């Protein structure tokens, strides 16, 4: 099996927008909840693999490398399990530009998937909190998790937007490459 050309990937991504835009509410919503959970699992695994390293200035860079190496497992679960992730579904714009789906179908998908992703992530966050995992390392994992959350929610809008664009660019690139593989 050979890898797809750029044109073939473009066509496949465009065609994939059709079932995403026409999928039933409950199917889409459940797949979106699962995607949010998978990304949260990836984030939790990333934090657990790196919290000792990122909490020490001497090993902070290595900790970020470990974290960045583990986190994509969440996206792999999304792609391999066929779940619906808002960031990857931004590629649906290609289907709109090719006139294969309507803007309204794309926007419907985005709203349902965004809400479902949020619920899935909250569900995993609640499970992790209830499980006691945040007490790992004498509570250091919880402290690092809170510090990360505070730093992300304290960003001004401009920085948060630019970081979001950069993140989404990489997610879409990963989905694009997986489509071509």
Over which residues does each language-model region extend?
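Alpha-helical transmembrane segments and their helix-helix packing motifs
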Residues: 1-181
């Amino acid at each position: 099996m050979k890898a797809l050309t750029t044109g073939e990937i473009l066509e496949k991504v465009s065609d994939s927008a059709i079932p995403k835009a026409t999928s039933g509410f409950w199917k889409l919503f459940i797949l979106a909840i699962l995607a949010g959970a998978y990304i949260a699992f990836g984030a939790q695994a990333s934090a657990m693999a790196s919290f000792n390293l990122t909490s020490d200035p001497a090993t902070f860079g290595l900790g970020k490398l470990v974290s960045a190496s583990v986190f994509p497992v969440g996206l792999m679960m999304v792609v391999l399990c066929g779940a619906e992730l808002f960031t990857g579904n931004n590629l649906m714009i290609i289907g709109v530009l090719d006139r294969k789906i309507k803007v309204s179908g794309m926007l419907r998908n985005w709203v349902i998937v965004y809400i479902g992703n949020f619920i899935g992530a909250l569900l995993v966050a609640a499970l992790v909190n209830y499980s006691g995992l945040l007490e790992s390392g004498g509570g250091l994992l919880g402290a690092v998790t809170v510090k990360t959350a505070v730093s992300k929610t304290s960003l001004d809008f401009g920085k948060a937007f630019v970081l979001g664009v950069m993140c989404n660019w990489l997610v879409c690139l990963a989905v694009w490459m997986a489509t071509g593989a």
